Design a protein with these regions (language model features):
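Hydrophobic alpha-helical transmembrane segments in multi-pass membrane proteins
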Residues: 41-45
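Phosphate-coordinating loops and pocket residues in cytosolic domains that bind phosphorylated ligands
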Residues: 32
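All-alpha RGS (Regulator of G-protein Signaling) helical domain and cognate RGS-like helical scaffolds
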Residues: 2-26, 35-36, 46-217
Length: 217
């Protein structure tokens, strides 16, 4: 792990740790406090209510906001890591698809491990609804998840205050873009469909993740 990724270097004055402790170490704490108490469960759904307030909060640069963005990123990385862990271990993949999945699996688990050194947030529980049981369905789902990850990181990069946190986030962003390109190719799609990517807000990303139904608690 590079020096960039140590908590001591990114959080020399303790601001991230202080803000993280204030937010809490569970996914429920994160969404409830970031959304100013708007955390009601979506019926049968993946995430909590009050998400527009959470998204609005991420447009104001501060060290506390950097912590919220890191926790948002960690939630997405938990999802991706769990998805690839299930797919690789499930036995439905083969050939170059399995090879790609193993590479991405290692990356996503490293992202989780690294982000967990920066902020405290427990992993959600997941139900991937058989998307890992069939190779074609897995490829299509992986493409969507990776495209979503790219949009999520690019959408939050302008909202990050601390240069070291920004550097950490953008170094993950470029890897997520490589993942997306690979699964686009495997899915028969254009590996680079445009000269410029359109970022997405946190609100839009959370809505997209909720729509999958993958996060169950």
């Amino acid at each position: 792990m590079s020096e960039l990724w140590t908590l001591e270097n990114i959080d020399a004055d303790g601001a991230i740790r202080e803000a993280s402790d204030a937010v809490g170490d569970t996914r429920m704490d994160f969404f409830k406090k970031a959304a100013v108490g708007g955390g009601t469960l979506v019926a049968g759904g993946a995430l909590m209510g009050g998400l527009p307030a959470l998204a609005a909060a991420t447009t104001r640069k501060s060290k506390k906001n950097d912590t919220a963005i890191l926790k948002f990123a960690l939630t997405l990385e938990y999802l991706e890591a769990a998805f690839y862990n299930e797919a690789v271990n499930g036995g439905a993949l083969s050939g170059e698809v399995l090879e790609a999945a193993k590479i991405v699996q290692a990356h996503e688990n490293t992202h989780v491990k690294t982000l967990k050194t920066l902020v405290k947030l427990k992993s959600p529980t997941f139900d991937f609804q058989n998307t890992t049981k069939d190779q074609a369905t897995f490829i299509a789902t992986a493409q969507k998840l990776e495209d979503t990850g790219v949009k999520a990181y690019s959408g939050q990069a302008p909202n990050i205050l601390q240069p070291t946190v920004l550097a950490a986030a953008t170094s993950i962003l470029t890897v997520e873009a490589r993942h997306a390109s690979r699964f686009r190719t495997l899915n028969g799609a254009n590996f680079a469909p445009a000269a410029f990517d359109k970022p997405a807000s946190m609100k839009a990303i959370l809505k997209a993740v909720k729509a999958t139904g993958f996060i169950t608690g």
